[in-house]
Structure formats: C-alpha cells, structure tokens
A protein has these predicted regions:
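Localized edge beta-strand/strand-to-loop motifs within extracellular or lumenal beta-rich domains
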Residues: 161-175
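Extracellular carbohydrate-recognition regions
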Residues: 22-43, 223-236
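Extracellular glycan-recognition surfaces and repeat-rich motifs
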Residues: 34-66
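Beta-strand-rich interaction surfaces with strong enrichment in secreted/lumenal proteins
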Residues: 67-74, 151-157, 198
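Bacterial N-terminal signal peptides
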Residues: 9-19
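Extracellular beta-strand elements of beta-rich domains used
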Residues: 31, 209-213
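Secretory/extracellular carbohydrate-interaction modules
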Residues: 61-146
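Short, solvent-exposed beta-strand-to-loop segments that form ligand-recognition rims
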Residues: 177-200
Length: 241
C-alpha cells in the first residue's frame, strides 16, 4: 500500500510539472546600459540623465516628468505591479511615481516636450502619481487627474536614504507600498486600470533605479526542474524508510 501511494504521488508530480510557469515581466530597466535606457524612456520636462547606472533628474523645478516610451508599453496592460527604488538627492520634496498615464500630461505652467506618439493621439487624458514627501516634504498622497486619488499618509522622505516603492494596479483598485509596508489601498474603477508608468520630481533632484513592471503571474521564472528534483528527493527519502 505504501508503494502504491508513492507511485500515485510520482504521477501527480509529473502531471503538475509538465506545465512550466513563466515570468510575466512587462517592462524593466536597471540602467546598466545608457544607450538601451534611452530607448525606453521619453522625458517630458527636466534634466534627466543616465549616470552611475541610475536615472537622475537634476533640475530643481516643478513638474519634471519622464514616461515609458511607446515601444516598451502595451496599452492593454491594466493589471500590473510597478516597482522602483528612489533616492532623493536635494530639494524641497520627495518622489512622484507615475502610473495609469494616458494622453497629454498636465503642463502646470511648464513647456512640456511632445509626448510619445500614442499618448499624443489619446483623446482623453489620465494621470496619476504617488506624491511621496509632497507639500514641502510633510505628507504623501496619490493625486489623480481623471480618476480617483487618495492614500493620504504622513510619510516623508529623508534625503540620501534609498526607498523601495511599489504600486499594485488593477482594473478596480490600486495599492501603494513603501519599504514593504502597505500604506493604503484605494478602490478605483473609473478608468479600468489602463495607462503607462513614469517617473517625476517636484523642485527636487532625485535618482531612480531597478524599475520593473510585471503582471499578476509575478516577475520570477518558476523552475519546474527545481520542483521535480526537490519532490523526487522527498519521495526517495520515503522509499528508503
């Protein structure tokens, strides 16, 4: 009877591991290759530079923005997690992490460069950003033009410290996470979760790194070979008992 149970388990393992789980990375940039990074980003305003394997924005003026280029974004993506590391260098505030961006971005008194072609042709504008350390670095909040803002918190940003920033975007909601701690989750079905991501600053110099956007299946490739070897070791141990 024991042998029969083990054989059944072997068959189940083989059935499960015939399907390989793939990673679902939509976009990523670690800025190791400036020439490649130049293709991935479209700066709208500010002094954006690829240096020291990071993406720097060095102008101390409001509304400095850069979005992912057309070639690296699929407008159908409406369910994604966006992660980035941020480090504020100097200035008045912290970070502006853009998501759900479509159409023309708010100029806010600045002469923005022409946006990516697809964004330029999108009739209805939509813009979200997680304002971290905003209002003179006194608080944080998701602001939205065309959708629903929220996620108010007392989070401020310390210059020179690295921050792990994550936004989980779905067609019905978005959740913002700072240094692995969930800050807030906001229900928002107004725009179905569509729109690309970007980076921005407000009267602040900052640098960004390790940008990744991935789908619901996650960013890591699950190795079926590792699963088989681990499970077989367990089965072998039982056979020897």
């Amino acid at each position: 009877m024991k042998i029969v149970k083990i054989l059944v388990k072997v068959l189940m393992v083989l059935a499960v591991t015939t399907s390989v789980s793939h990673s679902q990375i939509y976009f990523e940039d670690n800025f190791d290759n400036p020439k490649e990074s130049e293709k991935k980003w479209h700066a709208l305003y500010g002094d954006w530079q690829f240096k020291n394997k990071e993406y720097h924005q060095l102008m101390l003026e409001p509304n400095c923005m850069s979005v992912v280029s057309d070639e690296y974004w699929d407008e159908k993506w409406d369910n994604y997690t966006y992660e980035v590391k941020g480090n504020a260098i100097k200035g008045a505030e912290g970070f502006l992490i853009m998501f759900r961006c479509r159409g023309l971005m708010q100029a806010r008194g600045k002469a923005l460069k022409k946006p990516p072609a697809r964004m330029n042709n999108q009739k209805s504008s939509l813009e979200y950003w997680w304002n971290l350390g905003g209002w003179g670095n006194t608080r944080s909040k998701v602001e939205s033009w065309g959708g629903i803002g929220g996620a108010d918190s007392g989070d401020t940003i310390k210059y020179g410290d690295p921050y792990d920033i994550k936004i989980v975007n779905t067609p019905k909601s978005y959740t913002v996470i700072l240094n692995d701690k969930e800050v807030a989750s906001v229900e928002d079905t107004s725009q179905d979760g569509v729109g690309r991501v970007g980076l921005a600053t407000w009267s602040t110099a900052a640098k960004y790194d390790e940008v990744i956007v991935y789908g619901p299946d996650g960013p890591k490739l699950v190795s079926s070979r590792e699963k088989v070897s681990t499970t077989w070791a367990d089965i072998k141990s039982k056979l020897e008992q």
